[in-house]
Amino acid sequence: MSSIIFIPNDADNINSIMVTISSSLSLVGCLFILSIYIYYKELREFQLKLIFIMTINDFIISIIFLIATHIQTKYFDAITNVFPFFCNFPDSLLHYFFLSSFFWEVCIAHTLIQVIKYNNDKVEDNLKKYFIFSNGLSALIMVSLFFIRSYSKIDCHHDSIFPHLLFFIPLLLTWIYNIIVCALLTKTFKEQAMNFGYSLGINGGSGSYINFTNNNSIDNYSNIIIKNDLIINNNNNINVNNNNNNINILFHVNVNNNNNKIIIKRIRKTPNIIWTSIFFLFSFGFIWSWSILVIILKYLSLDVKYILMISYFFIPLHGCMNAVCFGVNDRLRMNLKKSCKNYYYKFLGLFSLDKRKSYGINGNNKNNKNNNGANCEERSLIDYSPDDDDDEDDDNNNNNYSDGNYYQIPSPFLIDSRNSSNLTDYSVILDNNNNNNNNGPYNPTRSNSITELLYNNINSLNAIRILSNNNNNNNNNNNNNNNNNNNNNNINNNDNNNNNNNNNSFCTIDEDETK
């Protein structure tokens, strides 16, 4: 019998099945996070690196559960006979790796509070300290447990209090520390929202709008971070300096033409990192509360059969819970969605001309070269060129796609800015990330600071499309005006031709009269 009950007995078939199901779910979740970290190089940041290391611990835990559940305990008795302080070798391994996983969760929470509350941009220097804290402290606890068992002659019965204290005390401290971090993060975001209101001159920091009149310049607020909706009026009198690179827009941008002012609308929205912390706290407490309840009922000599069965199912789900809470975020979903679109378009044969027409790419229109900006909203985000077999058909249709490879088009914002002349007034605001980063074109998934990265709510593509619609409407109006002017010119030309014909008829000389 193990002092910490992780693995059911050989005769417990139902409990073994439940452990197998839950540990398999955790194994799938861990493999998903590990694969994502290896495949997407742009996501290999410090925060995900910590999650990657914690996921390795959870992966090992899932493997131990699966192996120990389907192998009889007599095969581990040889190790127990040589090292009696192990009591049960698989349970001792699980004890160590669970402690290591708890401490890595503490390190992740510490990183969040350092970045968000204290604006510490050197948290990557703490990686070695995190390794020593997580793995070293876990090993120290296990060594102390083995020392107590060896020299105090304590048996391996489940009623022994020392293993329980050395496991559940770190567990409870981890949960309490994450509660404190969640409370501090919530308080910090509220303070930042209030300070944002005061910096813009909003009374009490709780107002909804700030107006920039014609005499004001947005450069006066060049160091703020806009975490709300920004409504920019299309007014050329407002001064937006191209050197303003420090305004960061994290949500939408809308365009109005009501008055001569810029309106910043403040929307109160709880950041996703807060919801992630809350979800982690509830799931962590729910998973381990059953195990704590089993220990309490055992000390009270009460029946724990059904509660122990629930505990066997939920304890191996610890890795799956970590994968869902920490691994699945907005940036990951955005990259997965983009990859799915790429493979979907590639393998369903969207290289042909007819399929491209269905996505708004018209190859028969000769004026398509000059109307790329007007058709930007109708395009798919990823354009593909035809394969080698379709080259002749595309040449006959005057199509611009003649390569044999597919490629990703530039950012939609760059297309809009090149083909829309009225976008220059706001390009400095929307393109601030591009100006601050010299590694390539604008990327909605890229963040200029670790603090901004934690929001994971960049929705600037919708803003760009709104601006594109406004500019496209202006271009359409200009085209209509030009067409009207051309029609008027044609009418005038027809009138002139009629007048000339009349003049010619009056100037004709009859030959009979001359004779």
Curated annotation (Swiss-Prot):
Record bears the keyword Transmembrane helix: yes
GO molecular function: G protein-coupled receptor activity
Matching SUPFAM superfamilies: Family A G protein-coupled receptor-like (SSF81321)
Cellular component aspect of the GO annotation: plasma membrane
Compositional bias per record (Low complexity), positions renumbered to this chain: 362-375, 397-407, 469-504
Signal peptide: none
Main location: membrane
InterPro entries: GCR1-cAMP_receptor, GPCR_2-like_7TM, GPCR_2_secretin-like, GPCR_GCR1_put
Bilayer-crossing regions: 17-37, 51-71, 93-113, 130-150, 165-185, 277-297, 307-327
Cytoplasmic topological segments: 38-50, 114-129, 186-276, 328-515
Domain of life, source organism: Eukaryota
GO biological process: adenylate cyclase-activating G protein-coupled receptor signaling pathway; cell surface receptor signaling pathway
Disordered: annotated segments: 362-409, 469-515
Function text: Receptor for cAMP.
Full protein name: Cyclic AMP receptor-like protein G
Species of the source: Dictyostelium discoideum
